[in-house]
Swiss-Prot record:
Matching InterPro entries: CASP/CASPL, CASP_dom, CASPL
Keywords for the protein's UniProt record, in alphabetical order: Acetylation, Cell membrane, Membrane, Transmembrane, Transmembrane helix
GO cellular component: plasma membrane
Subcellular location(s) per record: Cell membrane
Organism: Arabidopsis thaliana (Mouse-ear cress)
Protein name: CASP-like protein 1B1
Length: 197
């Protein structure tokens, strides 16, 4: 009996560290996706016509906030980053709090909501990136990635980070749900196992 309590406490501590590491990775991925896309901007000057021998130039700017899907992407990634930051702080500094009952359920529900949010944002941005890269002949939308290559490369990097965040949040959500079945005092510094002979 005492040995099983010690084993459970050791396993609980190890799973807490893994969950904390996953949250740190998810926080990094979603925050970097939000920052890269939020700072994504490229300005270029093109010749749009000629009057005689004089070229007429126009300056165009590609920014993330020109597309509502990219704005949603930045906001959603920032929200998921904030959620993970709160959960990390709670896990590190909330040593006296027991994660049982309603608290575990609320964390699991929030994790699932954040998986849904970041997945929707990443897929919406991926759709717009596809249109930007290849255009749409039926709607007569021209592609822009052949003209704004840096803008598209930064957007692709943000999408990769966001999809990494989606995968990490799926794993975190599964771990949160599994903790509902076997609740423990995750990362509790005050609880120490007692050995009873």
């Amino acid at each position: 009996m005492a040995v099983s309590k010690l084993t459970l406490a050791a396993t609980s501590g190890k799973s807490c560290k893994i969950l904390l590491g996953l949250r740190l990775l998810a926080f990094s991925a979603t925050l970097s996706a939000a920052i890269v896309m939020g700072l994504n901007k490229e300005t270029k000057t093109f010749i749009v016509g000629k009057v005689g021998n004089t070229p007429i130039q126009a300056t165009f700017t590609a920014k993330f906030d020109h597309t509502p899907a990219f704005v949603f992407f930045v906001v959603a990634n920032a929200m998921v980053s904030f959620h993970n930051l709160l959960m990390i702080a709670l896990q590190i500094f909330g040593g006296k709090m027991e994660f049982t009952g309603f608290r575990l359920l609320s964390v699991a529900i929030l994790d699932m909501l954040n998986v849904t949010l970041i997945s929707a944002a990443a897929n919406a941005a991926a759709f717009m990136a596809e249109v930007g890269k290849n255009g749409n002949k039926h709607a007569r939308w021209d592609k822009i990635c052949d003209r704004f290559a840096t803008y598209c490369d930064h957007g692709a990097g943000a999408l990769i980070a966001a999809f990494a965040g989606v995968i990490l949040m799926l794993i975190i959500s599964a771990a949160s749900i599994s903790r509902l079945v076997q609740p423990n005092k995750c990362c509790s510094t005050t609880a120490s196992p007692s050995v009873v002979p």
